[in-house]
C-alpha cells in the first residue's frame, strides 16, 4: 500500500495547491475551521468540495441576481434539478450541465458521461426522463482536430442517449475560433413527474441508513471537479485520468430501479442523490448538509472494481452510474433486494447521525472527521474585481459596420453554407429522436416538442445562446439569449415557463472576464423578469481558456414552455399555396456579430444595435395569441442570417416557393435585428389576424406552388430556386467534415 503524505508534509510541500486549494484557503481550513492540519484524505475532500465546480465560490454573488421564484416553481436551484407545475398534478423537471473540459480531452466519453450525469439528476428527483437536448460549440471546421472533436462528441451524445432509450430531440451547434481548443458541451435533460412523487436529496432522521447503489467505484474521474475548475494549458490537455467512463446500459438499469423504488415504495426512501461531480463525498455531504444532520460512512463497504483503493480515491472517484440513498431504518433489506434484482450493487455504507459531523472509516481507522458545514457552507465566497474589457472601447470608437453586398444571390447561398447556419442533420441523425414515440416536432426546428401522454398538452423545449453578441455587449447579449429561447418556444406554440442555464466563461480571476459574467447575468435576469421565466436550475463552467485565451462569454439558456393544446403546435415550414406571409418586427441595419460580418470580415466587431425587451415581449405575445386563436399556419423566428435565411428554411420541408416584397435594401435581408418572426396566415384569416396585430405585422408576400424564392427589395429582384438553396444548405457540413484541412 502506498504511504500517503502526512498532514505536515502536505503543508510543507504545498501539495494542496496541486489539488486547487489556494494558500489562503488552506490557511482558513487549518486555523479557523479545523484548528489543526487536515490529513491527506481530508485535504482531498476540501479540494473538491471547495472547487468552483462544487462550491460556486466565485459565482454565488452573481447567481443571486437571478429571479428564482414564480407561480409555477415547485423546486428552484439547490436540488438535483428544478421543477415547474404544468397543471393536473403534473410537473416538468429539467436541468442543464456542462462537460467542457472532459470533452476537450476525451470527447466521446466526456460527452457521453455529460449526458449520463444530467439524466441521473432528473430521475433522482423522481421524474421519468423524456428528452435530451444539447448545446455545442467548436472551433472552425478547417481544422482536423475540430472535426475529430465534433465526430466524437456527437457520437458520445448519441451513443449514450440511444442506448438508454431517451430521445435526443433538439439543440444547437455553433462554430467560432475561440472554441478551437476549448469546446463547449452542454447537455440538458427534461423529465415528467407526478407532483406527489417529487424527491429531495436530503439525509434526514438519525439512525436511517446510507446506501450506495449502482456501478462499482474505480479510479476514473478522480479530481474531475478540480479539473473542471481550472483552465487549459498545453501540458493539461493529457489529463485523461480526470475523465469518467460511462455505461449507458448500467444507467438504464439504475434508472429503472430508482424509479421503481420512488414510484412503488416511496415509504422506504428518505432521500436520493446522484454521485456526480466530486463523487461520493459531494452526494453524501450535501445530503447531510441540506438536512442539518451528520453522517458516518464505512468505506470498506463501498463496492470497488479496483484493488487497494485508498479512502482518498474512493471518496473522490467520479465513476459513473452511482447513486446515494437515504433509506428509512428497517427497510434496508427490501431496497437492497430491489436493486440486486436489476443486477446492481446495493450496499449499506453508513448511517445518519444527529451530530453534524462527517466521519469516514477505512480499514479500521477514522480517516476523516469534519464538520459537515466545513465541506459545504464554509467554502469561501469571492467578490472578484471587475473591469470593462478594453475591446469594447475600441468597438465604440469604430464606425458602424455596413456590409457591401454586390451579388445578393451569391451572398445568400454563401450564408446558407456557413457551418453555424447550414443543415445539422448529418450530426443529429446519429440521435434517436423518436424513441418512446412522443416526439412531435423533431430536431432542426425552432423548438422540439414532446407530447404529454394522456393529456392534450405538450412541452416545447430549446437551447439558445449567441456568444458573438455577448462578446460585443455582455448585458444586451444576455438579454438576447433569453429572448431568442423564448422566441423559439413561442414559435412552436408554447408559453415560456422557466429556464435552466450553463454559464460558460473564461478565468474569473481576470477582471474583464468577471465583468462579462456579471453584466451578462444582469441581462439574463432582466429578460427572465420580462418573460416570466425564472431560473430554476443550472450550472457554472468557468476557466474555459486555453493558454490564456478565453472563449466568448456563452451563457447557454435552456428553456421549457407549455403548449396548452396539441392543436396549437406550430412549425416553421410553409404549408399551403397562397398563404399570406407576414414579417413581425422592424428590420434595421444590425450586422454587429452577424453571420454576414463573420463571413465577410473573418471576425466580429462593432456595437450591438438597439434591443428592447418590451418590443420583444409584445411581438412574442402577438404570435402566441394568433397561434392560440388558430390564425397562424407556420411561425419561424429570425436569428442567424436574418430574413433571407429564415425564409429559405421555411421552404425546405415542403418545397414551396414564395413571392415577397420588402421595403428594405438588399443587404438588410441578412441583418440580424432581434424580435422578429415570419408567420403565414390563410387568406380567410387575414382580417382577423390584422385586427389583433395592430400594424406590428407587415404583409410581405404569399406562398407559391412554384419552388422559386422571389424577393423584391428596394434595390433589385432576387430569384433563387428552393432546390439550389436547399442543396447548398444540406451539402455544406458533410463537405466540410470530409475535406482535408
From Swiss-Prot:
Q: Which residues bind ATP?
A: 56, 95, 501, 538
- GO terms for cellular component: cytoplasm
Its annotated compartments are: Cytoplasm
Give the Pfam families listed for this entry.
AIRS (PF00586), AIRS_C (PF02769), FGAR-AT_linker (PF18072)
Q: What keywords sit in the KW lines?
A: ATP-binding, Cytoplasm, Ligase, Magnesium, Metal-binding, Nucleotide-binding, Purine biosynthesis
Name the InterPro entries on file: PRibForGlyAmidine_synth_PurL, PurL_linker, PurM-like_C_dom, PurM-like_C_sf, PurM-like_N, PurM-like_N_sf
* Source species, domain of life: Bacteria
Per UniProt, substrate binds at 98-101, 120, 244, 318-320, 541
UniProt-recorded name of the protein:
Phosphoribosylformylglycinamidine synthase subunit PurL
According to its UniProt entry, this protein's organism is: Latilactobacillus sakei subsp. sakei (strain 23K) (Lactobacillus sakei subsp. sakei)
Record gene name: purL
Amino acid at each position: 500500500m502506498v504511504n500517503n503524505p502526512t498532514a505536515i508534509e502536505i503543508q510543507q510541500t504545498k501539495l494542496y495547491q496541486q489539488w486547487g486549494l489556494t494558500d489562503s484557503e488552506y490557511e482558513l481550513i487549518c486555523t479557523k475551521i479545523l484548528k489543526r492540519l487536515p490529513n491527506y484524505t481530508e485535504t482531498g475532500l476540501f479540494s473538491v468540495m471547495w472547487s468552483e465546480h462544487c462550491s460556486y465560490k466565485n459565482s454565488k454573488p452573481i447567481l443571486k441576481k437571478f429571479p428564482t421564484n414564480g407561480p409555477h416553481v415547485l423546486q428552484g436551484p439547490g436540488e438535483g434539478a428544478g421543477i415547474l407545475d404544468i397543471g393536473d398534478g403534473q410537473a416538468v423537471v429539467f436541468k442543464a450541465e456542462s462537460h467542457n473540459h472532459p470533452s476537450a480531452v476525451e470527447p466521446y466519453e466526456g460527452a457521453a458521461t455529460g449526458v449520463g450525469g444530467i439524466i441521473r439528476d432528473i430521475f433522482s428527483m423522481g421524474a421519468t426522463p423524456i428528452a435530451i437536448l444539447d448545446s455545442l460549440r467548436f472551433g472552425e471546421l478547417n481544422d482536423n482536430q475540430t472535426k475529430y472533436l465534433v465526430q466524437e462528441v456527437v457520437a458520445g451524445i448519441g451513443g449514450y442517449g440511444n442506448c438508454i432509450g431517451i430521445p435526443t430531440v433538439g439543440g444547437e451547434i455553433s462554430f467560432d475560433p475561440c472554441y478551437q481548443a476549448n469546446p463547449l458541451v452542454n447537455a440538458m435533460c427534461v423529465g415528467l413527474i407526478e407532483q406527489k412523487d417529487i424527491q429531495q436529496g436530503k439525509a434526514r432522521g438519525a439512525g436511517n441508513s446510507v446506501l450506495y447503489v449502482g456501478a462499482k467505484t474505480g479510479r476514473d474521474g478522480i479530481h474531475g471537479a478540480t479539473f473542471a475548475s481550472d483552465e487549459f494549458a498545453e501540458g493539461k490537455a493529457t489529463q485523461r485520468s480526470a475523465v469518467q467512463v460511462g455505461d449507458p446500459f448500467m444507467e438504464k438499469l439504475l434508472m429503472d430501479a430508482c424509479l421503481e423504488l420512488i414510484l412503488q415504495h416511496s415509504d422506504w426512501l428518505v432521500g436520493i442523490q446522484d454521485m456526480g461531480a466530486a463523487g461520493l463525498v459531494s452526494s453524501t455531504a450535501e445530503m447531510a448538509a441540506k438536512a442539518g444532520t451528520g453522517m458516518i460512512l464505512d468505506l470498506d463497504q463501498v463496492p470497488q472494481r479496483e484493488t487497494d483503493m485508498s479512502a482518498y480515491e474512493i471518496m473522490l472517484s467520479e465513476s459513473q452510474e452511482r447513486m446515494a440513498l437515504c433509506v428509512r431504518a428497517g427497510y434496508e433489506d427490501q431496497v437492497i433486494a430491489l436493486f440486486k434484482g436489476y443486477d446492481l450493487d446495493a450496499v449499506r455504507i453508513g448511517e445518519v447521525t444527529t451530530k453534524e459531523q462527517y466521519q469516514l472509516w477505512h480499514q479500521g481507522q477514522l480517516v476523516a472527521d469534519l464538520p459537515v458545514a466545513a465541506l459545504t457552507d464554509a467554502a469561501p465566497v469571492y467578490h472578484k474585481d471587475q473591469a470593462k474589457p478594453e475591446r469594447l472601447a475600441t468597438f465604440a470608437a469604430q464606425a458602424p459596420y455596413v456590409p457591401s453586398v454586390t451579388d445578393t444571390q451569391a451572398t445568400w447561398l454563401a450564408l446558407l453554407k456557413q457551418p453555424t447556419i447550414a443543415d445539422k442533420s448529418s450530426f443529429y441523425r446519429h440521435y434517436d429522436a423518436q424513441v418512446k414515440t412522443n416526439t412531435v416536432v423533431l430536431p432542426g426546428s425552432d423548438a422540439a416538442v414532446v407530447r404529454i401522454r394522456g393529456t392534450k398538452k405538450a412541452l416545447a423545449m430549446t437551447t439558445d445562446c449567441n456568444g458573438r453578441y455577448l462578446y460585443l455587449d455582455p448585458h444586451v447579449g444576455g438579454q438576447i439569449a433569453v429572448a431568442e429561447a423564448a422566441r423559439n418556444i413561442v414559435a412552436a406554440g408554447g408559453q415560456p415557463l422557466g429556464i435552466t442555464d450553463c454559464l460558460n466563461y473564461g478565468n474569473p480571476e481576470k477582471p474583464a472576464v468577471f465583468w462579462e459574467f456579471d453584466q451578462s447575468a444582469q441581462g439574463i435576469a432582466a429578460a427572465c423578469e420580462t418573460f416570466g421565466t425564472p431560473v430554476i436550475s443550472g450550472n457554472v463552467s468557468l476557466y474555459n481558456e486555453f493558454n490564456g485565451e478565453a472563449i466568448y462569454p456563452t451563457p447557454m439558456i435552456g428553456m421549457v414552455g407549455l403548449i396548452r393544446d396539441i392543436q396549437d403546435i406550430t412549425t416553421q415550414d410553409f404549408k399551403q399555396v397562397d398563404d399570406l406571409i407576414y414579417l413581425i418586427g422592424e428590420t434595421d441595419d444590425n450586422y454587429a456579430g452577424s453571420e454576414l460580418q463573420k463571413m465577410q470580415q473573418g471576425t466580429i466587431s462593432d456595437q450591438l444595435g438597439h434591443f428592447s425587451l418590451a418590443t420583444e415581449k409584445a411581438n412574442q405575445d402577438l404570435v402566441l395569441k394568433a397561434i392560440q386563436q388558430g390564425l397562424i399556419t407556420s411561425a419561424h423566428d429570425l436569428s442567424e442570417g436574418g430574413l433571407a435565411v429564415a425564409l429559405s428554411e421555411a421552404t425546405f420541408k415542403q418545397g414551396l416557393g414564395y413571392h415577397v416584397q420588402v421595403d428594405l435594401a438588399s443587404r438588410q435581408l441578412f441583418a440580424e435585428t432581434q424580435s422578429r418572426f415570419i408567420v403565414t396566415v390563410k387568406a380567410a384569416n387575414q382580417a382577423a389576424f390584422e385586427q389583433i396585430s395592430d400594424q406590428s405585422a407587415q404583409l410581405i408576400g404569399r406562398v407559391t406552388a412554384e419552388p422559386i424564392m422571389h424577393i423584391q427589395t428596394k434595390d433589385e429582384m432576387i430569384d433563387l430556386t428552393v432546390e439550389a438553396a436547399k442543396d447548398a444548405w444540406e451539402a455544406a457540413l458533410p463537405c466540410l467534415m470530409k475535406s482535408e484541412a
